[in-house]
């Protein structure tokens, strides 16, 4: 559900902030964004007891800390942790291209107005949310999450390259871009399941913290790379690079899946 809610937030934010900017100016739009963030912070504080868990859960965590977990930092030596980090990093690079540069690139390549390209981005994120919802049911039944990711990412990469070639009309491109979002979204739950399988139970929180830092790193670096392509007037390269990052992320997911299957075979044979 965290993935679905995040995708919905990304889908709604352009419409909300662009509308406020048009009606009242960019300063008011920033104020609205700050007020929303502040409201969420207040909600988290008021409902903090839900996040802290039950007394039994807190007692169990205190017991583990008291006795010292063998996975305090040793999880950093696990190859799968860094493969998962690489997956998040590369997929975040692709996401940064979609978020920050794909609408502008579509505007240039297909001669579309800003309103339509912004709508295309919102449709991408809404489809991504729908894909995540459906992907949750698929991941619950899948024995190999990395293969679900492969199907989604390969299809999304092919669509991204097709968009870069400008072989289709503007309306068809928007439909394809929406389908691309659905394909990426349907892989989300399988991604989380893959990481959970590769994570030591005693260090799950720390592993997810390290792995998710790859998301922030990718979102920070991506605009620099895609911005260079735009500065060099290599606009089709935006979609080609998005496809390249998705396929590179797929390779790391495949390696994680292979490691998980190997470990499961070892555990079965013991």
Task: Please give the residue ranges for each predicted region.
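Extracytoplasmic gate region of multi-pass secondary transporters
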Residues: 80-125, 129-132
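C-terminal ends and interior cores of transmembrane alpha-helices
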Residues: 155-168
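Juxtamembrane intracellular "pre-TM" segments in multi-pass secondary transporters
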Residues: 52-83
């Amino acid at each position: 559900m965290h993935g679905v809610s995040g995708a919905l937030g990304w889908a709604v934010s352009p419409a909300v902030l662009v509308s406020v900017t048009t009606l009242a100016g960019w300063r008011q739009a920033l104020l609205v964004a700050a007020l929303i963030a502040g409201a969420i912070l207040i909600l988290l504080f008021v409902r903090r007891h839900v996040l802290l868990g039950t007394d039994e859960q807190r007692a169990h965590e205190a017991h583990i800390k008291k006795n010292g977990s063998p996975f305090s930092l040793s999880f950093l030596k696990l190859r799968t942790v860094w493969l998962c980090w690489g997956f998040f990093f590369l997929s975040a690079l692709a996401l940064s291209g979609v978020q920050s540069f794909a609408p502008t690139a579509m505007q240039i390549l297909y001669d579309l107005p800003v309103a339509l390209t912004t709508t295309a981005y919102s449709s991408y994120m809404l489809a991504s949310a729908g894909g995540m919802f459906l992907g949750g049911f698929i991941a619950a039944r899948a024995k190999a999450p990395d293969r679900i990711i492969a199907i989604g990412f390969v299809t999304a990469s092919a669509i991204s390259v097709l968009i870069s070639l400008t072989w289709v009309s503007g309306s068809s491109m928007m439909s394809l871009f929406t389908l691309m979002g659905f394909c990426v979204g349907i892989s989300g739950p399988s991604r989380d399941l893959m990481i959970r399988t590769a994570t030591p139970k005693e260090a799950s929180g720390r592993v997810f913290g390290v792995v998710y830092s790859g998301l922030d790193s990718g979102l920070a670096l991506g605009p620099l790379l895609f911005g260079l392509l735009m500065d060099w007037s290599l606009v089709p390269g935006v979609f080609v690079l998005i496809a390249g990052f998705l396929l590179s992320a797929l390779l790391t997911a495949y390696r994680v899946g292979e490691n998980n299957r190997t470990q499961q075979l070892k555990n079965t044979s013991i």
